[in-house]
């Protein structure tokens, strides 16, 4: 992705959060220059990858395949004694016409909540023991206290306020229901590790390579400078 695309996506996500009164923590507003002076008191932000996260999944067409996210809180699976939180929270922004590709998580379970805007469609499949997609078996779905069964590949429609529970090894993808508008989502989960806990099918990247065509508006969660001693 070009840095200009990343900056544009960040501003759009920021505006969507403001529109739906989802106020962000202070570290989301630090400029790149301000990050240069942040000491070890912000190690949790660095080590747990809190903050902004823009991806095109390495496909080079963000408006068709992409997602904009903010990790607001998180623990660490590898540094549990230092960061003992067992939960994470994100905000996610999906534009109409965008698609977030099919994947599951080995470790975390999560609730995906429609926080406002249009309707999101989440397609679900079970997985086989070899981690391939099960295109045949029915899927047990949990939405807002309701448990029911749907055929493989069904898209679960979430209107604002509705949510779905995604268990481990459940393949799922995201798109916006056409004509309903961009969507702001929430995610509540176990600890999040996007470097090691995404099984995409077909395989693809999670974090984009960035072409620096302008200065960054905000740093992404993978870009923080080391703390000054």
Predicted region positions:
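A short, N-terminal "cap"/entry segment at the start of jelly-roll beta-barrel domains
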Residues: 1-87, 216-223
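A short beta-loop-beta micro-motif enriched in histidine and acidic residues
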Residues: 77-88, 99-111, 115-116
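Short, conserved secondary-structure segments in the cores of folded domains
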Residues: 90, 110-111, 154, 162
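Conserved metal-binding segment of the jelly-roll/cupin
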Residues: 95, 152-179, 185-190
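Glycine- and acidic-residue-biased ligand/ion/polar-headgroup-sensing regions
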Residues: 95-96, 108-110, 114-130, 134-135, ...
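Short helix/loop capping segments that flank catalytic or ligand/cofactor-binding pockets
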Residues: 102, 123, 174-175, 196
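Double-stranded beta-helix
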Residues: 129-148, 175-229
